[in-house]
Amino acid sequence: WLLDQEGGWIPIRSRHHRRYKAAMRIPRRIQPLVDDGLVDEVIRPLMSGKEADVFAVRCGSEIRCAKVYKEAGKRAFKKAAQYQEGRKVRNSRRARAMEKGSRFGRDQQEDVWQSTELNALYKLINADVRVPQPYGCFDGVLLMELILDGEGHVAPRLSDVSLSPEQAREDHAVMMRYVTRMLCAGLVHGDLSEFNVLVDEHGPVIIDLPQVITAAANNNAARFFARDVKKITAYYGLYAPELLTTRYDGEIWSLFEAGELHPESDLSGVYQEDTHLADVDSLLDELEAVEIEELERLESLREEAREG
């Protein structure tokens, strides 16, 4: 049995499969995997995103997912440098080349971008976060598990699923547990939303991690974490409005900063803003105003000296 255009299954020997198979050309980037025996057949495209195209493929007797990363010039992912800050490159020669922006350095940067998702998937599986099982990344093609729903169809994205208030609350709690475990593993998704979560019979599955952020080494981590939590909460809040008043983003991050966050930390969704931070901002504004006033005073004195 193979996937049809709508995500269902059709017999492998049916006339519908023969017609679709004849029309499906093997993408250029997947051809080497076919030549090496890693992929036996490309069944159909599943989706096209801002950083990759995804295909259903057959590997022996298993149907898997092949994510073909787009080249840097064709990716529509904005402000990639903000996400990549803090990613470590062990080889010093590679690191220097990447800093200089040479052709070799750009190639190495691509390798790092493409391997980041693979490494994150393995790390998150070990952290008990539900993500697709990876099988390896080969020349910019990530082979991984194809997530299916309870009826054997390709699992829908969260954005395509309607939820009862009870289910929304339950799944939101699961997602807050997942982002907590991710943060305990040192990672922030960086682009989490209803479009990057699949839903199978067991609940949410997080996908799309090439932009994943190293929490302790990236100056943007807190901002991206807050955005992730707020966006996913806003979606579940469409079905359970009481979730919209929660502040899991601040609660979880404050525990993380204090070194008190654990994978199974008790969470309440209640967080009180630290007003001291606002006072510091006000003080900085005042200091800047004083500095500007002093510069203007000195310039005025210089003007008087020139005129005198």
What are these regions (language model features)?
Residues 60-71, 154-161, 165, 193-238:
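Catalytic activation segment of kinase domains across protein kinase-like and atypical kinase folds
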Residues 184-194:
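Catalytic-loop of the protein kinase fold
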Residues 1-48, 60, 166, 170, ...:
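Regulatory N- and C-terminal appendages and interdomain linkers associated
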Residues 2, 7-13, 18-154, 180, ...:
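Conserved ATP-binding subdomain of kinase catalytic cores across diverse folds
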Residues 107-110, 161-168:
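Short, surface-exposed loop/turn motifs that are enriched in glycine and acidic residues
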Residues 140, 196-199, 248-255:
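A glycine-rich phosphate-binding loop feature that marks nucleotide/adenosyl-phosphate handling sites
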